[in-house]
Amino acid sequence: MKYNKLVDHTLLAPQATVHDIDKLIDEAIKYDFKSVCIAPTWIKHAKEKLAKSDVLVCTVIGFPLGSNATSVKVYETKIAIAHGADEIDMVINIGRFKNKEYEFVLNEIKAIKEECGSKTLKVIVETALLTNEEIAKVTEIVMQSGAEFIKTSTGFSYRGASFEDVEIMKRVAQDKLLIKASGGIKVGDDAIKMVELGANRLGMSKSIQIMEDLEKK
């Protein structure tokens, strides 16, 4: 298993400087990670730095709360792609979902997917704020949307992905939707277990330590 190609090497801290982003990019090139996941303000810079590599540029939309107007999220997506983003990780409107406004949530995801075109869309549902039943329901919604991935977490709530989150998503989605586990993956065994349970992508800020841990196994 080439775990490096499952990794979205992530730095979304608001205080991240260009020096921090360059370090992230250099690490991603060295380890040949799937992507760097960064704030929209750094897309152009990352795209230029990664021009001669296979590492993709992933960014976030409606992040981290998800409560922007749909039109704002769509416009954010348009600008992100124009600046060179290869993959989009959007946050659903969590309050609307918990209010059982399922059609609103579905239509918003569809609108952003339409703007993405052939670019990969991952839908962040913030499992820390959902019951197990809600995780199953939101997985069903994402399956109907045309998005490629469902993603567990922003990394900005009180916890990241749990093994149970991924188990529920996999049970509902089976092979009809890819799963990104993000946040809370701290050691190599966490990464291994997430993949065994069905995760197809791992969003991690501790990617280097985890890769070093995996190399020892």
UniProtKB/Swiss-Prot annotation:
Pfam families: DeoC (PF01791). Pathway: Carbohydrate degradation; 2-deoxy-D-ribose 1-phosphate degradation; D-glyceraldehyde 3-phosphate and acetaldehyde from 2-deoxy-alpha-D-ribose 1-phosphate: step 2/2. It is an enzyme of class 4 (lyase). The keyword Chloroplast does not apply. Its EC number is 4.1.2.4. The keyword ATP-binding does not apply. One of its GO terms (cellular component) is cytoplasm. One of its GO terms (biological process) is carbohydrate catabolic process. It is found in: Cytoplasm. It catalyses: 2-deoxy-D-ribose 5-phosphate = D-glyceraldehyde 3-phosphate + acetaldehyde. One of its GO terms (molecular function) is deoxyribose-phosphate aldolase activity. Signal peptide: none annotated. The active site is at residues 89, 151, 180. Keywords: Cytoplasm, Lyase, Schiff base. HAMAP family: DeoC_type1. PANTHER family: DEOXYRIBOSE-PHOSPHATE ALDOLASE. Catalyzes a reversible aldol reaction between acetaldehyde and D-glyceraldehyde 3-phosphate to generate 2-deoxy-D-ribose 5-phosphate. Belongs to the DeoC/FbaB aldolase family. DeoC type 1 subfamily. This is Deoxyribose-phosphate aldolase. The lineage of its organism: Bacteria, Bacillati, Mycoplasmatota, Mycoplasmoidales, Metamycoplasmataceae.
